């Protein structure tokens, strides 16, 4: 099969991911179909299957492109979720749309399957930041990773991604996320996870 053309506009994956979030904002994940996706994106089915094996594969790619791996790096360096440096990160161009898409992934139209994809992505980012694999963790460390990732997703799920809409003011979206970032339990949890993974990395180096 020949490679799909790119005439200088958004690539097929970019169009498919944009269509995915548009559909997911109005349709439960289990009701999103390949036919609806390719129609919304303006591509053909061959183009979809050139890039992805199925809807879950697209969801993983979309999640990878949305989750802010930079936050794990900043927190690992000793900062808190509410720090000025993290605030500056959220105010970079395009960040509000990434946040809006993240809220869609964890919102009312998500499912246990999709939340699992998001949770695994969050966990993989934290593990990669410390040079770890899941098998490097002790049971209590793995439990901490699961707990903090799940808690962060639970907090995000409380924010309605449609409160501003796709064309709404990004400042409101960022203000809502700033409120979440200032919650003390999130600060404590993020610091605890960073310390836990730091200990796991030190133990791995000593083995």
Predicted feature residues:
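Helix-turn-helix
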Residues: 23-57, 61
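C-terminal peripheral helix-coil segments that are non-catalytic and often amphipathic
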Residues: 128-131, 161-207
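Short glycine/proline-centered loop/turn elements that form peptide/ligand docking sites
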Residues: 28-35, 55, 133-140, 193-194
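Short Lys/Arg-rich basic patches
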Residues: 1-7
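Amphipathic alpha-helical packing segments from all-alpha helical-bundle domains
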Residues: 87-88, 108-135, 139-154, 171
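Hydrophobic alpha-helical connector segments
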Residues: 73-107, 111
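Alpha-helical structural segments
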Residues: 11-22, 40, 57-80, 117-121
């Amino acid at each position: 099969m020949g490679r799909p053309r790119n005439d200088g506009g958004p690539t097929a994956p970019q169009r498919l991911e944009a269509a995915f979030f548009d559909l997911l904002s109005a349709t439960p994940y289990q009701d999103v179909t390949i036919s609806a996706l390719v129609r919304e994106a303006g591509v053909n089915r061959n183009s979809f299957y050139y890039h992805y094996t199925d809807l879950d594969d697209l969801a993983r790619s979309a999640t990878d492109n949305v989750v802010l791996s930079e936050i794990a790096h900043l927190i690992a360096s000793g900062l808190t979720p509410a720090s000025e440096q993290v605030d500056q990160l959220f105010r970079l161009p395009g960040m509000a749309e990434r946040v809006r898409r993240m809220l869609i992934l964890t919102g009312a139209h998500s499912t246990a399957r999709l939340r699992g994809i998001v949770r695994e992505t969050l966990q993989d980012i934290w593990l990669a930041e410390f040079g770890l694999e899941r098998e490097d963790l002790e049971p209590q460390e793995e439990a901490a990773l699961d707990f903090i990732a799940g808690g962060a997703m639970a907090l995000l799920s409380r924010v309605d991604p449609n409160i501003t809409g796709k064309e709404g003011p990004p400042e409101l979206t960022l203000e809502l996320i700033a409120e979440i970032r200032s919650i003390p339990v999130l600060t404590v949890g993020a610091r605890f996870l960073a310390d836990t993974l730091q200990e796991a990395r030190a133990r791995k180096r000593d083995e």
